[in-house]
């Protein structure tokens, strides 16, 4: 079985991004800039934001983090976003989720300039994706990263049956739309399964490419996968494991040990899709910089 190594590919991408940033610094005197806003003290969000800032520094991008208390009024957050929209040194704006309950996440998404929406969540970017205008939009980072992995590993997709398990706005819906596009790395027949789908296994067993993004540990078992399928595991779930020092370990939405005996190619957890998300966020930020400066 081929292991689709997202960590390895993300490092290759970072080297490519760094080379582009260095070139633009020399030719224009400017570099891309990413600003991340975090509201509250969610530990997982703080770790993720630190990783983004660290990666920006490694490739030479400017990055800043705006930290706000959990009781921040929505109006204050929206005013901050409005200022960043007008800042020519900021090419990407990301508001870390989850947000406190007093803040409307959709209002925040709408407030971000679509040209700086490097998370790809704004309705304008999603609409352009659905209509096939990928050169004029930002694609959500996790689906974008999966497409990059499929391309770099030479996975044949055109005409294949892709089954996406999960319909979130962050992964499931954009992933399905991306795999529908007339692109070399997609062009699939697509089926979406979700919590109300009856007999999910009857669909997943038909998949040439199975993408699991349902948020349930080891949900996809060997009896749900046909031999030779390509399996992409988006899930990150922490389960109890008394054999580890922490007492827990990370697993995906797929039973890796069982399914890997059937799959022709598969992403591990950790080290598969996860590392690609930040890399694609920075690739989107670079694209925003290039569009801004007509490069």
Swiss-Prot record:
It comes from the Bacteria. It catalyses: (6R)-5,10-methylene-5,6,7,8-tetrahydrofolate + NADP(+) = (6R)-5,10-methenyltetrahydrofolate + NADPH; (6R)-5,10-methenyltetrahydrofolate + H2O = (6R)-10-formyltetrahydrofolate + H(+). GO terms for molecular function: methenyltetrahydrofolate cyclohydrolase activity; methylenetetrahydrofolate dehydrogenase (NADP+) activity. One of its GO terms (biological process) is tetrahydrofolate interconversion. Keywords: Amino-acid biosynthesis, Histidine biosynthesis, Hydrolase, Methionine biosynthesis, Multifunctional enzyme, NADP, One-carbon metabolism, Oxidoreductase, Purine biosynthesis. GO terms for cellular component: cytosol. NADP(+) binds at residues 166-168, 195, 236. Pathway: One-carbon metabolism; tetrahydrofolate interconversion. The keyword Amino-acid biosynthesis applies. Its EC number is 1.5.1.5, 3.5.4.9. Homodimer. Belongs to the tetrahydrofolate dehydrogenase/cyclohydrolase family. Catalyzes the oxidation of 5,10-methylenetetrahydrofolate to 5,10-methenyltetrahydrofolate and then the hydrolysis of 5,10-methenyltetrahydrofolate to 10-formyltetrahydrofolate. This is Bifunctional protein FolD. It comes from Chlorobium phaeovibrioides (strain DSM 265 / 1930) (Prosthecochloris vibrioformis (strain DSM 265)).
């Amino acid at each position: 079985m081929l292991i689709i190594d997202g960590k390895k590919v993300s490092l290759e991408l970072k080297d490519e991004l760094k080379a582009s940033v260095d070139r633009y610094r020399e030719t224009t005197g400017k570099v891309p800039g990413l600003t991340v806003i975090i509201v509250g003290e969610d530990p997982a969000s703080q770790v993720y934001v630190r990783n983004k800032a660290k990666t920006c520094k490694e490739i030479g991008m400017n990055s800043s983090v705006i930290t706000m208390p959990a009781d921040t009024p929505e109006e204050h957050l929206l005013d901050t976003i409005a200022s960043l929209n007008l800042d020519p040194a900021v090419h990407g704006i990301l508001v870390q989720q989850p947000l406190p309950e007093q803040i409307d996440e959709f209002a925040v998404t709408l407030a971000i300039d679509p040209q700086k929406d490097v998370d790809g969540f704004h309705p304008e970017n999603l609409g352009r994706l659905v209509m096939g205008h990928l050169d004029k939009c930002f694609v959500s980072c996790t689906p974008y990263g999966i497409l990059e992995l499929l391309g770099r590993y030479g996975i044949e997709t055109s005409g294949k049956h892709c089954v996406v398990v999960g319909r979130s706005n962050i992964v499931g819906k954009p992933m399905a739309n991306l795999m529908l596009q007339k692109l070399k790395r997609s062009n699939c027949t697509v089926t979406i399964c979700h919590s109300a789908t009856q007999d999910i296994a009857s669909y997943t067993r038909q998949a040439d490419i199975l993408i699991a993004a349902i948020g349930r540990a080891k949900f996809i078992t060997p009896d749900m996968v046909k031999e030779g399928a390509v399996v992409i595991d988006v899930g990150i779930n922490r389960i109890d494991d008394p054999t580890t020092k922490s007492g827990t370990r990370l697993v995906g939405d797929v039973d890796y040990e069982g399914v890997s005996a059937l799959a022709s190619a598969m992403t591990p957890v950790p080290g598969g899709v996860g590392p690609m998300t930040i890399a694609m966020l920075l690739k989107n930020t670079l694209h925003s910089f290039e569009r801004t400066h007509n490069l």
